[in-house]
């Protein structure tokens, strides 16, 4: 999920703090009233982050889990949605400069972001898992990785999780390559976010790998708004309604084959 804290994010943090010192808060006048008056909720999203926000190869239409969540939230607010495609490294700067009203792009909740932005209740809950070949019953816990080989992107936090568990880590470029090595029996497992595994299984229909165990790590993905924005309460209400009426579950099932809007 989207957890990186880049130089661009540092500049954004400074801008937010300076705005707060100016006395008016970064939310300013009622953001909700402005959205209602305009009849549009402007949403910052990448458009290059499958299966959350990406362009369908056939139609080139912007689609994805987060794209549909954004549309559903806007509908609950009684407005249309307008997507503002923005690279991840500048997406928070775009929010601060009011290019859009909210970010819906798998923003992971953490203490730094809680201090800088208005964050909604979670609409996605993900967890670390260990994927193995479907016919391998030797891994049932994180401790079972000791002495085994795992395929990991060396810059990811999952590589550290595997190493700390005593695994021998082989570097790969991403999850797809990790699965290839796993199926070729060149490694015993790969540690990753459950959403990556579920997306792979749903999009490929490949039943040769399975989720064998959980790492115990979870993360929550939220909608980000400007600090002090009254949109947070309205979005929270919309998300609660979407959870209650089954919309979030339906969208989750479409993209992942299971409900990722709630903790399993």
Regions inferred by a protein language model and the residue ranges of each:
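C-terminal motif of bacterial Sec signal peptides marking the signal peptidase cleavage site
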Residues: 15-20
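Extended ligand-binding regions for polar small-molecule ligands
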Residues: 22, 67-68, 75-76, 156, ...
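Extracytoplasmic small-molecule ligand-binding "clamshell" domains
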Residues: 28-104
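Short loop->beta-strand "edge-of-pocket" segments that line small-molecule binding or catalytic clefts
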Residues: 40-45, 142-154
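Short helix-initiation/N-cap motifs at beta->coil->alpha
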Residues: 67, 83-93, 137, 154-156, ...
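Acidic, polar ligand-binding/catalytic clefts
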Residues: 71, 80-144
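Periplasmic-binding protein-like
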Residues: 125-129, 198-240, 258-264
């Amino acid at each position: 999920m989207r957890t990186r804290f880049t130089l661009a994010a540092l500049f954004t943090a400074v801008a937010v703090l300076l705005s707060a010192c100016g006395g008016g808060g970064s939310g300013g006048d009622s953001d909700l009233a402005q959205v209602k008056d305009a009849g549009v909720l402007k949403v910052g999203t990448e458009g290059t982050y499958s299966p959350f926000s990406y362009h369908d190869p056939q139609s080139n239409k912007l689609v994805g889990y987060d794209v549909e969540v954004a549309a559903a939230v806007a509908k609950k607010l009684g407005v249309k949605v307008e997507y503002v495609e923005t690279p991840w490294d500048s997406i928070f700067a775009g929010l601060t400069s009011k290019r859009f009203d909210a970010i819906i792009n798998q923003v992971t909740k953490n203490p730094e972001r809680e201090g800088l932005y208005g964050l909604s209740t979670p609409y996605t809950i993900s967890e670390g898992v260990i994927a193995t070949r479907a016919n391998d019953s030797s891994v049932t816990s994180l401790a079972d990785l000791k002495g085994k080989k795992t395929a990991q992107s060396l810059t990811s936090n999952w590589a550290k999780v595997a190493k700390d568990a005593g695994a021998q880590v082989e570097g790969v470029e991403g999850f797809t390559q990790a699965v290839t090595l796993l199926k070729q029996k060149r490694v015993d497992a790969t540690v990753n976010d459950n959403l990556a595994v579920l997306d792979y299984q749903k999009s490929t229909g490949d039943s040769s790998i399975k989720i064998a165990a959980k790492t115990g790590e979870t993360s929550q993905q939220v909608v980000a708004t400007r600090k002090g924005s009254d949109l947070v309460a309205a979005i929270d209400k919309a998300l609660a309604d979407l959870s209650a009426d089954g919309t979030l579950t339906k969208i989750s099932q479409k993209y992942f084959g299971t409900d990722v809007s709630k903790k399993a």
